Amino acid sequence: MEKFAPEFVGEDANKKAEEFLKHRSFPSEKPLAGIPNTATHVTKYNMPPILRSSFKLPSPRVAANLTEPSAPPTTPPPTPPQNKEEQPKESDVDIETMHVCKVPDNPEHSKKPCCSDDTDTKKTRKPMVTFVEPEEKFVGLGASLYRETMQTFAADGYDEESNLSFEETNQEPGSSSVEQRLDRIEEKLSYIIGLLNTIMVATAGPTTARDEIRDALIGTREELIEMIKSDILTVNDRIVAMEKLRDEECSRADTDDGSACYLTDRARILDKIVSSNAEEAKEDLDVDDIMGINF
């Protein structure tokens, strides 16, 4: 302003100053057009000194990258027309830029996070339901017997029924194998469980009929248990016999050195002929003697 001080005084100086300020862009606190509830913030970036006259002033975005690359300006300021008299000196130039930030109406709303937590939106999976057999089923005279049998013979798939009866299974060829005997034992055990269920149903009838049915079913159960025991014993006996045969074969193979020779009937006849003619070694055997042997 020292340049204009001696030339413009009073009203002329004020007019010149107002005209100069009209061409300059200053930030205002009023909201911009089309953007409600906004406030302006001013940041300054220092430009490096111009070394030569041919150097062009870079854009505000490039100037921001030279000084502070982490905070580039969003909108470049308008470039006002400059007269020859108003050109600044070749020194550091301050460039003012405006950053427009949207200010919410409610200040409490800014404290809340933008997106809700994923943990709140996730649906909690319900735990799996386990079905427990009610204790009311074990009521009656045969409750303890039923409970003990279920605990003793409980297994995976014990309730699977077979298409064949006990007699049809026994009539099958090769039914003496161990696997088939075990299958029959499993079927009999499942049959026992069915009998126990029948006992539980029979306890709801009259006293005399209930006692008779219970005695009959318990007797059938005892018979089936005896049959199972006999099958198990026969299986065990066969296993023991097979082990004995295997041990005998192993011991014979260990002691046999090939010196013992067992002659068949034909070998004995030939041995007699050879032994009878041993004294007459010079004479050859007759063909008729050899042909008379029935091979």
From Swiss-Prot:
Residue ranges of the region described as Disordered: 51-122
Region described as Binding to RNA-directed RNA polymerase L: 263-281
Keyword Nucleotide-binding appears in the UniProt entry: no
Region annotation (Binding to host phosphatase PP1) ranges: 125-131
Residues recorded as bearing Phosphoserine in the entry: S162, S165
Binding to the N-RNA complex: annotated span: 281-295
MF GO annotations: RNA-directed RNA polymerase activity
Keywords tagged on the record: Host cytoplasm, Phosphoprotein, Viral RNA replication, Virion
Pro residues: bias regions: 70-81
General function of this protein: Plays critical roles in regulating RNA replication and transcription through its interactions with multiple proteins. Tethers the RNA-directed RNA polymerase L to the nucleoprotein-RNA complex. Recruits the M2-1 protein, a processivity factor that is required for efficient transcription of viral RNA. Acts as a chaperone for neo-synthesized nucleoprotein by forming an N-P complex that preserves N in a monomeric and RNA-free state and prevents the association of nascent N with host cell RNAs. Recruits the host phosphatase PP1 to inclusion bodies to regulate viral transcription.
Subunit and partners: Homotetramer. Interacts with protein M2-1; the interaction between the two tetramers is required for the anti-termination and elongation transcriptional activities of protein M2-1. Interacts with host phosphatase PP1; this interaction recruits PP1 to the inclusion bodies. Formation of a complex PP1/M2-1/P allows P to target host PP1 phosphatase to the M2-1 substrate. Interacts (via C-terminus) with the nucleoprotein N (via N-terminus); the phosphorylated phosphoprotein P binds to N-RNA complex. Interacts (via N-terminus) with the monomeric RNA-free nucleoprotein N.
Protein name: Phosphoprotein
Organism encoding this protein: Murine pneumonia virus (strain 15)
Protein's gene: P
